[in-house]
Amino acid sequence: MARKTPIVRYRNIGICAHVDAGKTTTTERVLFYTGLSHKIGEVHDGAATMDWMEQEQERGITITSAATTCFWSGMQQQFPQHRINIIDTPGHVDFTIEVERSLRVLDGAVVVLCGSSGVQPQTETVWRQANKYEVPRLVFVNKMDRAGANFRSVVQQLRDRLGANAVPLHMTIGAEDGFEGVIDLIKMKSIHWNEADMGMTFEYGEVPEDLLEECEEMREYAVEAAAEANDDLMEKYLETGELSEDEIKAGLRARTLANEIVPVLGGSAFKNKGVQAVLDAVVEYLPAPTEVKAIEGTLIDGETVDTRVADDDAPFAALAFKIATDPFVGTLTFFRVYSGRLESGTAVYNSVKQKRERVGRMVQMHSNNREEIKEVLAGDIAAAIGLKDVTTGDTLCAESNKIVLERMEFPEPVISVAVEPRTVPDQEKMAVALAKLAQEDPSFRVATDEETGQTIISGMGELHLDIIVDRMRREFGVDANIGKPQVAYRERITRTCEVEGKFVRQSGGRGQYGHVWIRFEPADDNNAEGLVFENEVVGGAVPKEYIPAVEKGISEQMRNGVLAGYPLLGLKATIYDGSFHDVDSNEMAFKIAASIATKNLAAEGGAVLLEPVMKVEVVTPEENMGDVVGDLNRRRGLIQGMEECISGKVVRAEVPLAEMFGYATDLRSATQGRATFTMEFQQYSEAPKNVADEIMARNGR
């Protein structure tokens, strides 16, 4: 099947931002202007098209990333038709994982900021993630009609707080209630959108006198930024002092794609102003799949690095970036095609699980309406129905050309609660529901506490787990009781040690004999996970066939901890000696011997308890500043800094998660509900001795 849209006219973008900056409203407007939704859905009516889960409509926040395809030909129909695949991502810190995996498969991003709040903590997180994946981006300063909105101040914050080379392409006309429209700095014309037809039409006008001088300065800055793209442009600019409109756009595009500048636009999505210009900017300044670095992967030998370029005739390679359970069709696997083509009904190879799978049907999503398609090509984002064993981050490829694309890294959960079904019939349904939800969301884990037999669920924050429990009730009909939230502590050793583990049972008949010497070393990083295991046994002191059992014994004991029953982080273990018995040695004996050696780490390795520390940011009125800082200090917080912002003072601190339960209520009562806070996981740090002793006593150690 031939392509309807050439790949150079594809744009795969994400719309991401801090919670409440107006991402979903912006996306709704995009769908309206591109002709996909005939009635604009409002977030505060609970009718937004992109927020299709019931919880999202109730809470007015976006939880999952809905993927949508739309088409755009420009505000003045000045472009050939471009195909824009949009992923609307959540801004709440507990769902950072959704943002991370969306950015992983996108070519460009639109970061939405609030005109009055400016750069907020989640904006910094999104920015860091976009830097990590080298995603070119542009910024839309939204909500310019809100009290306290200030375009210039937000541009300055982008430079100061994010270190971004922000290049404004708009200047806003008026602000707050007096917000009228924007000035296009490249054309040096004002744009007023028509309110009668919800901004579908607009008029160009002259730049208001009082803004002329400032706009000329800002335009000069943009032209200089464009001229730095290459020698030809710079030469022309130095000779004539001017560049044509097309040259300015070409220069800005080249530098945006190279992540050297960030174009900034302004408007108000709610008031239907500015979103159309953002769509034009997406076409003009963000990359097509062919303009980004070809994705790298490793061949099946696990070492050779290869690339996949965006070409329909190259071998097929795609990345599954999200699994969703749909009430009507079952499991939907969202995937991004990097190279090649795939027809529905054909087989693909999952190179991570090393399994063949058949793709039943494929659909293109418009929020949660779906259109069935027969074929996907390089650059497409689609969802497949009928893939059984695919999980987030798996690579789908042609069996004749196997490759594993870069895996995604998912954060460790920081908070756990026990869940119990209310009735016996709920028991089985709960197991099925939790398994499906864990398959969808890699930052959510399910485990069984071996001592109590309780089911423990873990996630990235209280809201995250609330929503999981809510979804169990709504989507799977499971009622559950929830325990008190528990902090996910960890353990680690602080020094290198050599430990003996010996397990001997020889009292007539077949005995047990396992004996090992293991050198344990701590990882350099407090937050390193897992076990690095090496075998340095020479001369057959421990036969090769027992070595895997030794590794298994260590890793099982690591899961149960050595101090207070919490998993042991970042450990390097090297078996270098031991002994065996011709008759009595077996795998089980060596596994137990290794487990005994690991248990001895509490004393030998100077094991310590680690607690999750959160990065907390509180925005408070000035008069409550003292109370807020005092309260954070009481919670063992380390104040990192304070600064002014439009709505008062911002206090930044690092606080142990254990001290943050119930903080929202305490902060509300201390400031009469005027302060707000956000927190996200920062790192694991050693817990003070008195805290560690208390936890060990509580766990009966």
From Swiss-Prot:
Family: Belongs to the TRAFAC class translation factor GTPase superfamily. Classic translation factor GTPase family. EF-G/EF-2 subfamily.
Alphabetical list of InterPro entries matching this protein: EFG_II, EFG_III, EFG_III/V, EFG_IV, EFG_V, EFG_V-like, EFTu-like_2, G_TR_CS
Function: Catalyzes the GTP-dependent ribosomal translocation step during translation elongation. During this step, the ribosome changes from the pre-translocational (PRE) to the post-translocational (POST) state as the newly formed A-site-bound peptidyl-tRNA and P-site-bound deacylated tRNA move to the P and E sites, respectively. Catalyzes the coordinated movement of the two tRNA molecules, the mRNA and conformational changes in the ribosome.
GO cellular component term, pick one: cytoplasm
GO MF: GTP binding; GTPase activity; guanosine tetraphosphate binding; translation elongation factor activity
CDD domains, per database record: EF-G, EFG_III, EFG_mtEFG1_IV, EFG_mtEFG_C, EFG_mtEFG_II
Domain tr-type G: 8-290
Domain of life: Bacteria
Annotated protein name in UniProt: Elongation factor G 1
Keywords of the record: Cytoplasm, Elongation factor, GTP-binding, Nucleotide-binding, Protein biosynthesis
One biological process term in Gene Ontology: ribosome disassembly
Key word Transferase present: no
Pfam families listed in its UniProt record: EFG_C, EFG_III, EFG_IV, GTP_EFTU, GTP_EFTU_D2
